[in-house]
């Protein structure tokens, strides 16, 4: 099993101690670039394993601990990972597959991040967990902190989705709301710097991404996808992107599989955004994604940031990928379509990859014979507002069969007995 030997800048490869997890890369910062760190190991992850007999430990993403920063025996786990990969031909998007992360313990992909981060928090002897979150990351941090027996403070903002905030509270987190979103980071920074609270989420700007040890757990999505396709990786991986933690983690996972000879190539990656920051950076060639001028609120609060990250931008460039700006009406339409056609109800942000695939197929970027995997990051129950706004009100029927059929026709266009 590999052992973490350093934290390395995702952009310039500068090396730092393994305890540098609460900071960005000072070398890049001096050049005006804000870059996250990633875990480097004393040996190549997965090297020496038999591809014909990959890990078969039951229960969680920690079956892949030969690729990770801690052992399954040390892990703080709630059975996260091993989510289904579902073929979705009814969507009209060609050979598209859904990696359904809504099946995780708190119903989002953030459970992987939380498990990876809390495992190291426990190893480091953390006394308090701190997270700044609009919902999913905070709920996951709260749940895994509860499992680890470590107090958790979550900073969120007034207006965050009610079910998500309730979920954080249900897991025992000390939830603090702020009026100004920037105050989340200011207060969390004070806790981290003054008291040594262990951060699982971004908490300073410009944002670089989340806890490097948490991001390692996202590599397992790549392992699961590759294994599901008998190690023939898809042509495209399409993700909803805010700060790009899962984007970077998946890319790193595919790179590791290629490095040990389990796969032949790495997929091209697509970031589905609402801000347009990454598309602007790809077009300009700048090393830093810009802060966009988009001020309108979005239904996709999980990806509502106004600025992308270097870690996202670098992955898109390295894989000859793409970034697509999606609109609220597109996501709302895809939420309804996914629920009605595939029986999967995603949160609004999780619908963004499908809108992006639609755009890229129309442009000819994604070819008809190419396979795409869309990461569905969280369940619609966490924020039901978008689909509620898009659906008709159920009719009230007082009467018999005639009245019933009239109501079904008027409300739903249903004409069959």
Describe each region flagged by the PLM.
Residues 1-417:
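PLP-dependent amino-acid enzyme catalytic core
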